[in-house]
Amino acid sequence: MAVGSTTTRAGEAALERLRQWPGEHRVAIGLSGGVDSSLTAALLVEAGWEVEGLTLWLMSGKGACCAEGLVDAAGICEQLGIPHHVVDMRETFQQEIVQRLVDGYRDGITPLPCSQCNRSVKFGPMLDWALQERKLPRIATGHYARIRHGGDRGRHQLLRGLDTRKDQSYFLYDLPQEVLGRIVFPLGELTKPDTRLEAARHGLRTAEKPESQDLCLADHHGSMRAFLDAYLPPRQGEIVLADGTVVGEHDGIEHFTVGQRKGLGVAWGEPLHVIRLDAAMNRVVVAPRAEAGRDSCVVGAVNWVSIDPIEAPRTVEVQVRYRSTPVRAELSPLPAIEADQQRERPHRCRLSFEEEQFSITPGQAAVFYDGETVLGGGLIQRE
């Protein structure tokens, strides 16, 4: 099917950026079967790029990462007249994402699988495949983020997408420079409504496809609880105050997260918040809000994206959850501990918040920003 003309200014601007892109216009597009990646492919084709579709097969069964996504991605490639390839990543996904996720919940942290998946399952392997198997110099995806090339000391800088409601830079902080330098994000300056309008104008079969509202593993199993129940048997334990006073019971610490207030099943004189998950004692530790705040946290395995590693404290805006509002904090370098010396990213920092924070969750990412630019990020550590 021929690609139609665009109707939005944002779509026209995206096409012009693609036409003016420096270097070779040859790319592998990561196709999930959703509207965002579908429109990305359509824009690249319309801009005159040589495009090949690539879908990563992550899980067996139904869902966006499985049969449904594969079928829709293949249909989009047929509609646009481009090749479609499928790479079986199920074993890697099971080892790198599923098992690590289960281990993290078992150990009392709340992992962030999406950033790890982007680094070790999606972008890295996708670029390797494009370069080695198809001799394609670039990869593209439908993420709402932007890249500025030739920034500080020649680095490839990651920027927020212009649509603040859809910005996905938080999940991309962990990508290395060698990958960022070869990525194309055509939707970085579009809004989601722009994307829907452009997809409809192009007559894409996915134009009205609803978005996934949860982690792909949760969608796959029906809910996050069902996913965890499939891997972790119930383990009854106590819900306690910080002084050890028992106030309730639970059937698994994996069903709780630091900062949680609702769904505790505890009757108390005032609302209680989860402040710690004690895996060794199989306890959920709770406290009133007045005792639940944190003024600092340690961030480990830091990946410096748009700047070199800092050597002195600096003020940043930091986001500690995907949907959280960025807050101001002082970012200070810490010496690497012995356990981190042999790691790929041994950098550690301390974040000191200007105002007390209430959902500082071990295992989640803390991503550092300077305005719209991602400086770097890492994983919140237990202390």
UniProtKB/Swiss-Prot annotation:
The active site is at 117 (nucleophile), 216 (cysteine persulfide intermediate). Its main location: cytoplasm. The record marks 143, 364 as: Interaction with tRNA. InterPro entries: MnmA-like, MnmA-like_C, MnmA-like_central, MnmA-like_central_sf, Rossmann-like_a/b/a_fold. It is found in: Cytoplasm. ATP binds at residues 30-37, 56, 142. It holds the Pfam family tRNA_Me_trans. Residues 166-168, 321-322 are annotated as: Interaction with tRNA. It comes from the Bacteria. It catalyses: S-sulfanyl-L-cysteinyl-[protein] + uridine(34) in tRNA + AH2 + ATP = 2-thiouridine(34) in tRNA + L-cysteinyl-[protein] + A + AMP + diphosphate + H(+). Its EC number is 2.8.1.13. Disulfide bonds join 117-216. It is an enzyme of class 2 (transferase). GO terms for cellular component: cytoplasm. GO terms for biological process: tRNA wobble position uridine thiolation. Keywords: ATP-binding, Cytoplasm, Disulfide bond, Nucleotide-binding, RNA-binding, Transferase, tRNA processing, tRNA-binding. The keyword Methyltransferase does not apply. Belongs to the MnmA/TRMU family. Catalyzes the 2-thiolation of uridine at the wobble position (U34) of tRNA, leading to the formation of s(2)U34. This is tRNA-specific 2-thiouridylase MnmA. It comes from Synechococcus sp. (strain CC9605).
